[in-house]
């Protein structure tokens, strides 16, 4: 049901779009403090929402890939609260924020789909916060596996998994190697 609502929501958003934009890897879609004029639906690629910390670190607030609305929390803000940075080459549907606001006021189906989408994003954020609070790679991986009943992704997706749980790819590979050795020793 949520997936159907999400598809309908994304189609509706695409219908409100005034254009599709492309961004090269490393390019900013917007910066903290910029006026919020548009929301973006990521079609291809990955965008990170980041905040630069006083100590020089970068906090990744959101990892938006295909089918994710970028900076949805800014729909009722006058300025962006973070930077949107393309991690890879990105194609995104751009929608004037005024059209989103109008649709929320005038279309109850859209408003319900939007609320459902935000609820899902909040659950995902809580999951990421829980995983990030764990100290070891093993604990983070276990938590990710518990949240995602699909099991370990294919080898080609391990770098994205490492990014998702906030560890280096090398640390994840070492943990997976330990588990593989453990599986062989235990006969599983």
Regions picked out by a protein language model, each given a short descriptive name:
Residues 90-99:
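A short hydrophobic beta-strand segment most commonly corresponding to one strand
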Residues 1-25, 69-70, 74-75:
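Cyclic nucleotide-binding regulatory module and flanking cytosolic helices
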Residues 20, 63, 94:
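Short aromatic/basic micro-patch
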Residues 27-88:
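Cyclic nucleotide-binding regulatory domains
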Residues 98-136, 140:
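A small-molecule sensor/coupling module
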Residues 135-188:
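Phosphate-/nucleic-acid-contacting segments
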């Amino acid at each position: 049901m949520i997936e159907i609502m999400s598809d309908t929501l994304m189609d509706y958003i695409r219908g409100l779009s005034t254009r599709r934009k492309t961004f090269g890897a490393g390019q900013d879609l917007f910066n903290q403090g910029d006026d919020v004029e548009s929301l973006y639906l990521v079609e291809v690629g990955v965008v990170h929402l980041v905040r630069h910390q006083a100590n020089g670190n970068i906090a990744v607030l959101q990892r938006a890939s295909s089918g994710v609305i970028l900076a949805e929390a800014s729909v009722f803000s006058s300025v962006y609260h973070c930077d949107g940075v393309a991690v890879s080459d990105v194609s995104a549907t751009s929608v004037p924020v005024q059209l989103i606001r109008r649709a929320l006021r005038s279309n109850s189906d859209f408003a319900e789909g939007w609320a459902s989408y935000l609820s899902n994003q909040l659950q995902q954020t809580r999951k990421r916060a829980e995983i990030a609070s764990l100290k070891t790679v093993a604990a983070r991986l276990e938590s990710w596996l518990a949240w995602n009943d699909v099991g370990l992704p294919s080898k080609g997706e391990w770098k994205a998994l490492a990014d998702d749980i906030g560890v280096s790819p090398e640390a994840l590979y070492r943990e997976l190697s330990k588990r593989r050795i453990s599986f062989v020793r235990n006969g599983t």
